[in-house]
Amino acid sequence: MSVEKKRQSWHWFLLVGLEKRIFATGLDNIKPIANICQVENGIFIPNMEDSSFLEQNFIYHIMQVLVKHIDTLRKYTPFIPQFISHEHIDASCRKSDYAIIDLLNKSENKSEEMIEILEYVHDKCIGKSDEETQLHLKMRVFGGDVLTNERAYSAQLALHNGTSELDRLQCVIHRPEGLHRIMNHLLFIYQQFYKVTSAGEPGTLSHLRNTVGRVDVHGPDEVIQKYRSHYAFVEDCLDAFIVGAYMHLSGTQNLQTESPLQQTMFNFLSDEQKYTFIHKLAKDILDKYVKTDIHNIRRKTDALDTQSSQLKDMYCSEKMKYVCPICNKLYKAKGGMKRHLNKEHGFSFELGDENSTTEKDHIATYRASFMTCALLLRDTNDAYKMGDGNRITVNAKFQMLLARVGKHTKYQLWLFRYLAYIKCLLTPQMAYEYMWNCSANLQGGLGRNIPNDNLVEILVQTVKKKVYCQGANASYASVRKAALTTQIQEEIKENLQSQCDKKKSGSKRPKANKTSDILEMVSELNAAQMFDSIPGREFRSFSGFEDLFTRINVSELHSWITENRERLSYEVLN
């Protein structure tokens, strides 16, 4: 630093191109899947099939924990699938092709510069036909965190009155990418289940953190800055809760003793019988200690969809009023018609809430809710590792509901838009490719995918190293040149290493052995009777803790989805 060149804050935009690995050329690519104004709100809410699908994935993760930490169950390891398979497993194992397209001297924080970024994308990255004004139907996905999505979306809205797709910058579609989705879900977990004031209450996350001395875990305030340590702690806590649940279910005092839940004549049983046993054990743990009721949300949403459809049928377009089907009385507003039907004809528009009069065990609810959220976090992370677009999409429905509970309004909105693109706004071909190309594989191989925004973060860190190497001589021009030659330099390095028969440096971090920490947490959980059912008890710091999904006001959620469906119908031009 000198008098002429003081410390500066540079805001540049790194544009990375990633080639799709999964295609759906056999699907229709002419018109959108559905008119978003005509679909029911229920398609954005998890249904019975989604819940069952998620539960099967949870059972898989529980089985993996059991055979990993419990000595007497390790013999079942060969009979459990190594991974959750999907129809594009071979394509997800292929190494991804990507390139740094450019480093733009633009800041996404400024509206006019965000417009210029999108103009650059349309100019350089969108294929044109012979006539310059005509664009191919193929569009590009513009991914990033929700702030990047929001700014790009707002830039498009600013030019909504343009005469062509090019003028409106409509040839990019937006996608909230995985790393920031996982980060937001992890932040939600800490906001709901971690309080420093609960450190003296055995069984809470804060108490477990102090028990095993995780000094790098500080709660929701530092989740983003210290993501890796906070993520690892939640993973370890989940393992401890699952192991503790197994001990409570089997009635064992320690993990070395034989459990009464054993198969006799193990060596004479078929592989299917062995798998059935460990699967049932995991399912029993899920049903007794984890499972929460989400079906009530779907039931109420379907009821509201039916009411909305009935009221829509009462509207007369000629009279521009609602007509009562019983007495033919006219009303201008939907609210007036609902009040009339309720008062004069006994129609009920209230959703019956099932209020239990029995006293609840709020500590058991805390346990079940935490295990549900932590399993959802693990399954979403695993889905991105495996490049499983279907799992990523199903989990987005549950994450959207939890984002509403946590008042993460931007993530709720963008998860809804993500689902809307897949369910309605895109053509079948575009929706399929949009859903399945959410990850990149830098090395090639099974389970080595990372979210697309994680790839960008890695490349950003690489470019920052170039900036630091240049020191006071760094400028936009020099850093841009370094960024555009980074991949070429890496290829030259790899070729030289190959010719010299030099071993490549490892691309994996060594795994720390956390068994002792997990066993210590299990002891604390058992001592706190976390797996018992004792009505009336609660944590002082989490007074009256309720199941997360029961906190959702379904009527308000239904209205919110309806409002945003209508908004997308005119903001996104098809």
State what each model feature region is.
Residues 1-574:
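Buried hydrophobic core signal strongest for RNase H-like alpha/beta domains in large
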